[in-house]
């Protein structure tokens, strides 16, 4: 039988099983590790989402038909301002 890879879901299930068996100190330690791993997973996922959004945005920008230099300049400036505004709010 194949062994499951450790994921935040299987680790949290493991935490519940250990808690039922006893040893409160061990469970608290496992819980903290679990929370850290879940946060790391969340941050990695959000970074991938941000990268995907940026890539999609540039693909959309590059797919414009017959862009003039002025329209490109305007579009780049709008994107730059929006990007800077988001950076300041984060």
UniProtKB/Swiss-Prot annotation:
GO terms classed as biological process: symbiont-mediated perturbation of host apoptosis; symbiont-mediated suppression of host cytoplasmic pattern recognition receptor signaling pathway via inhibition of MAVS activity
Residue ranges, annotated region (Mitochondrial targeting sequence): 65-87
Signal peptide residue numbers: none
Keyword flag Membrane: yes
Region (Disordered): 1-28
GO-annotated cellular components: host cell cytosol; host cell mitochondrial inner membrane; host cell nucleus; membrane
Keyword hit for Membrane: yes
Subcellular locations according to the entry: Host mitochondrion inner membrane; Host nucleus; Host cytoplasm, Host cytosol
Annotated site residues (Low pathogenicity) in this chain: 66
Assembly and oligomerization: Oligomer. Interacts with human SLC25A6/ANT3 and VDAC1. Interacts with host MAVS.
Family recorded in the similarity comment: Belongs to the influenza viruses PB1-F2 family.
Function summary: Plays an important role in promoting lung pathology in both primary viral infection and secondary bacterial infection. Promotes alteration of mitochondrial morphology, dissipation of mitochondrial membrane potential, and cell death. Alternatively, inhibits the production of interferon in the infected cell at the level of host mitochondrial antiviral signaling MAVS. Its level of expression differs greatly depending on which cell type is infected, in a manner that is independent of the levels of expression of other viral proteins. Monocytic cells are more affected than epithelial cells.
Note: Is not encoded in all strains, and seems to be dispensable for replication.
Annotated protein name in UniProt: Protein PB1-F2
The species this protein was found in: Influenza A virus (strain A/Ann Arbor/6/1960 H2N2)
